Each structure stands twice: as structure tokens, then as C-alpha cells.
Amino acid sequence: AAPHGTGHVKAGLNYAMSLHAIMDAHRQGYDENMYLDSATRTKVEETGGANFIFVTKDNTVVTPKSNSILPSITRRSLIYVAEHYLGLKVEEREVYLDEVKDFAECGLCGTAAVISPVGKIVDHGKEICFPSGMEEMGPTTKKLYETLTGIQMGRIEAPEGWIKVIE
């Protein structure tokens, strides 16, 4: 997404523009693309269909902040769960590609999957591997997932205003 662009809007054209890139990634054996900021190409933004969520070694939840990425409801919900249900520190800030190697956990969040674990990021042949691996979520990511899906399924009490009865 570009400054003053439409990356912050959930629009069909935004998804269409990423189709060539994702098809190319799949041909090369990758599941997804990591999009960086267009100005410096040093800051993590999002993938074609999900937002990033990182966890530091001291259990701080970090999400990239940019005016050019989609303000995901799932990401916002996970931030709320992290702070108010799990008592975790949360940082919404610029995340530099150079610091990604230092995170303990990485996931992609969105409506359908809630959170999917990321085990490895490949940057021009350089591999960044996360301790939790690709098959399982890390412990903090798993707690976030279980708490948010528990709220969605009615097993955990929802915050005020999150659920509306439709008759």
C-alpha cells in the first residue's frame, strides 16, 4: 500500500492488485507475501489478506501501525483481548523488517482464521525462523486465539457492546 492510497480500505481492487504477487509467491513455494512500506521498503505493513501480529520474548504483543494498511477488526479485537483479558502489554508501532528476527512469535490475523501461525519468513534468500514453528501457534498467540474464539462462541463473556442480538 502506498501513502495516500487505498490500502486502508477493504476494496476489491486492493485484493485484485495483489493477485499477481501471490500467484508468483505460490509458484516459488511460499504461502504469502509480506508487504513493506512503499516509501522506504524497510517497515512491515501486511500481507495481501491479513495483518501481522508479533510477540516479543517478554510477551509484548506488537502490531504494525501505518495509515496505508487495513484497520482490521480482528486485529483490533486481538489487541483488546491481549490488554484487557490477558493483561499483556501491546504496542501499535512501526515494525522494521530488520527487527522481525528478534520476535518470539509471528502470526497473521484476519476474519476467517482469526490467527494463523507464521513459522518462517524468507527475505531474499535469508530465512527468519520463529521458535513456535509453522505447525503450531506460540503460547501467547494460542492464548489470544483461544480467548477471542471463546468470546465469539459464547464460552467467555464478551466485552460490552461486542455482541448484538438480531431478531
What are these regions (language model features)?
Residues 1-46:
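Short, conserved active-site entrance elements at the starts or edges of catalytic domains
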Residues 36-167:
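Conserved catalytic-core subdomain
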